[in-house]
Amino acid sequence: MQTPPEYIPPAGSVLMFSTTWCGYCRNLKGQLDRAGVSYTEVNIEEVDGTAELVAEVNGGNQTVPTLIFPDGSSATNPSLATVQARLADVASAGR
């Protein structure tokens, strides 16, 4: 799946697709905040087309949190360590 350009976050940050009721999303946001990881949140129940995008990334399931990285790759319900490692990998690759 090709991530639409409007959902590619700037270097050093991630875009998080979430919902207001998602406990995993709240947990990950708290971890990202405490670790100083920059992110933009997009509620898939409020932004047209994003639920479909998340479903496409996740084999037909609207699973959140789904994160998009600066290289256009994604991860579903990742740990903080995974997010930090992926951001470091993207940065070292110069993306």
PLM segments and residue spans:
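Short amphipathic alpha-helix with an adjacent loop that forms part of the alpha/beta core around
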Residues: E52-N58, R86-V90
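Structural micro-motif
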Residues: N58-L67
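Thiol-based oxidoreductase modules, predominantly thioredoxin-like and allied folds used
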Residues: V37-A51, Q62
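Local sequence-structure signature of Cys/Sec-based thiol-disulfide redox active-site neighborhoods
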Residues: Q2-S38
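Non-catalytic, surface beta->alpha helical segment in thiol-disulfide oxidoreductase systems
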Residues: F69-R95
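Glycine-/small-residue-rich active-site loops that bind phosphorylated ligands and cofactors
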Residues: G23, E46, S74-A75
